[in-house]
Amino acid sequence: MDSNTVSSFQDILMRMSKMQLGSSSEDLNGMITQFESLRLYRDSLGEAVMRMGDLHSLQNRNGKWREQLSQKFEEIRWLIEEVRHRLKITENSFEQITFMQALQLLLEVEQEIRTFSFQLI
């Protein structure tokens, strides 16, 4: 993972944690938690791809990795829809910018995970 992506994740997570969205703050905290979990998963897939032969240890360690991968794609789709919804309802420009950047980053991460998974298949 390149340093720009790391800083993008850190920047968006920091800005999202500063937002006050009233009654939906629990939902936002859940989004932040899922975002962080997604980043860690993407990083671990990327590391597995970097180490040739890790495919076999990944498959041995986790016989259900395809199922796990499918679940992560569902999480990404949910987060994308949630971010799009937040983007539509917010009128605060700081929040709009943050959610637009989060959406762009989610789409990039989805593509990276797809690329990693194709290399692992």
From Swiss-Prot:
<keyword id="KW-0945">Host-virus interaction</keyword>
<comment type="similarity">
    <text>Belongs to the influenza viruses NEP family.</text>
</comment>
<feature type="short sequence motif" description="Nuclear export signal">
    <location>
        <begin position="85"/>
        <end position="94"/>
    </location>
</feature>
<keyword id="KW-0813">Transport</keyword>
<dbReference type="InterPro" id="IPR000968">
    <property type="entry name" value="Flu_NS2"/>
</dbReference>
<protein>
    <recommendedName>
        <fullName>Nuclear export protein</fullName>
    </recommendedName>
</protein>
<keyword id="KW-1048">Host nucleus</keyword>
<dbReference type="Pfam" id="PF00601">
    <property type="entry name" value="Flu_NS2"/>
</dbReference>
<feature type="short sequence motif" description="Nuclear export signal">
    <location>
        <begin position="12"/>
        <end position="21"/>
    </location>
</feature>
<comment type="subunit">
    <text>Interacts with protein M1. May interact with host nucleoporin RAB/HRB and exportin XPO1/CRM1.</text>
</comment>
<dbReference type="GO" id="GO:0042025">
    <property type="term" value="C:host cell nucleus"/>
</dbReference>
<keyword id="KW-0946">Virion</keyword>
<dbReference type="GO" id="GO:0039675">
    <property type="term" value="P:exit of virus from host cell nucleus through nuclear pore"/>
</dbReference>
<dbReference type="GO" id="GO:0044423">
    <property type="term" value="C:virion component"/>
</dbReference>
<comment type="function">
    <text>Mediates the nuclear export of encapsidated genomic RNAs (ribonucleoproteins, RNPs). Acts as an adapter between viral RNPs complexes and the nuclear export machinery of the cell. Possesses no intrinsic RNA-binding activity, but includes a C-terminal M1-binding domain. This domain is believed to allow recognition of RNPs bound to the protein M1.</text>
</comment>
